[in-house]
């Protein structure tokens, strides 16, 4: 049986950290931003890690940070945009808890994430489109999908909390049967 960990999945700019912090407060659970955990553990920003050690090393650090959550319970975890694209990470996440894909159209992401040279994998619009196209099939394997384009962060939290209430009331036999929260 999976433990009580909720993983928020999605592209940069969809609000995983904002929603995660709000959801954790609502539930009385701990909130963990995986990128911040990596930065704290390695005393470097994500940008510095990419610049000095490369993406491959960063992805190893990401997997290690996920493995460090194995004994945790009652946590809401905001994943970095690329964490769920790794098969090993998806397997770890499925073993530890449940994933919610915060789905948002590209145009909204573009408005939320203007070109930002501090983001290691996002330098221009075509690059963003390509990266999203590569990651989307992985995001879509999440346990649940929530279309967030017309929702406030509080509205997203409400949707996740409603789903969790269904789990605890026993109205859902098995989490993962229903993949859409929209």
Language-model segments: residues:
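NTP-dependent small-molecule kinase module
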Residues: 1-2, 22, 26, 72, ...
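Walker A/P-loop
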Residues: 17
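P-loop (Walker A) phosphate-binding loop of NTP-binding proteins
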Residues: 11
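ATP-binding Walker
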Residues: 14
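Hydrophobic anchor at the beta1->P-loop junction of P-loop NTPases
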Residues: 8
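Post-Walker A helix-loop "phosphate-sensing" segment adjacent to the P-loop in P-loop NTPases
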Residues: 25-36
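ATP-dependent small-molecule kinase phosphotransfer cores
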Residues: 34-94, 138
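A glycine- and Lys/Arg-enriched "phosphate-lid" helix/loop adjacent to the NTP-binding pocket
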Residues: 95-137
């Amino acid at each position: 049986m999976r433990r009580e960990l909720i993983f928020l999945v999605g592209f940069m700019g969809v609000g995983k950290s904002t929603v995660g912090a709000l959801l954790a407060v609502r539930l009385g659970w701990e909130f963990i931003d995986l990128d911040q955990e990596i930065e704290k553990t390695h005393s470097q920003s994500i940008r510095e890690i990419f610049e000095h050690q490369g993406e491959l090393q960063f992805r190893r650090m990401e997997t290690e940070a996920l493995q460090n959550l194995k004994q945790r319970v009652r946590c809401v975890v905001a994943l970095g945009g690329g964490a769920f694209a790794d098969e090993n990470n998806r397997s770890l996440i499925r073993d530890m808890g449940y994933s919610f894909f915060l789905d948002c159209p590209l145009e909204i992401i573009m408005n939320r994430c203007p070109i930002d040279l501090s983001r290691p994998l996002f330098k221009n619009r075509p690059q963003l489109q390509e990266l999203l196209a590569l990651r989307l099939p992985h995001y879509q394997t999440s346990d649940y999908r929530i279309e967030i384009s017309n929702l406030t962060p509080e509205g997203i939290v409400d949707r996740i909390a409603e789903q969790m209430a269904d789990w605890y009331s026993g109205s859902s036999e098995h989490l993962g049967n229903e993949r859409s929260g929209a």
